[in-house]
A protein has these predicted regions:
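N-terminal and secondary-structure boundary signal
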Residues: 1-189
Length: 189
């Protein structure tokens, strides 16, 4: 599938999901059980404070120790792209980031680093989003991603068109990478 076909498919899917949003929300709100008793790899939790919802979801998935082993270096990459206060919900919720950091450390992580490549001024984004303060208070190291010097070239031998990429050193030096986007439900998402 080429990029144009992918974008068309994505647009049609988005339109269908917008029309069927209420049906999709009904599906997500259902109480489902793990009838087979196997390992769960997807959990949807709705309603409540972000940190409580995360605790519930990670417990359903077997706990953070399923993903973090003692001594590992962890990168938590939230969305800190915008110079917005938490009340505007433009970035990942700082309470959620703090809870994930705490859970990683409780599972035995050697260190947890939090960073994002921001769209607005990184220092304002980190501060005004509340994520810098929350992450540090939870025990994480916070680092920027705005300088080219943070990125190292990586070969992509199986790439069809892209044969190399520059990857942030925090990711290259980590054992575990946790992406924590902000969930969006607007048409631009």
């Amino acid at each position: 599938m080429d990029r144009r076909d992918f974008l068309k498919t994505l647009a049609v899917t988005g339109a269908v999901m917008t029309v069927q949003r209420s049906e999709a929300m009904d599906i997500l709100a259902q109480k489902l059980t793990n009838a087979g008793g196997g390992k769960v790899d997807l959990v949807a939790v709705m309603g409540g404070e972000p940190e409580a919802m995360f605790r519930r979801a990670i417990t359903e998935m077997g706990g953070m120790k399923q993903f973090i082993k003692p001594g590992q270096k962890v990168v938590v990459k939230p969305n800190i792209g915008w110079d917005k206060v938490p009340e505007l919900a433009g970035n990942t919720n700082p309470k959620l980031v703090a809870e994930i950091v705490k859970q990683c450390l409780a599972a035995g992580a050697k260190e947890v680093t939090v960073f994002d490549h921001t769209c607005d001024d990184w220092q304002k984004c980190y501060k005004n989003s509340g994520i810098e303060e929350a992450a540090k208070a939870a025990g994480a190291k916070v680092m920027p991603a705005h300088l080219e010097s943070y990125y190292k070239p990586v070969s992509l031998p199986k790439g069809v068109r892209m044969k190399s990429a520059k990857v942030h050193e925090a990711i290259l030096n980590s054992d575990v990478w946790i992406n924590v986007p902000i969930l969006k439900n607007h048409g631009g998402a």
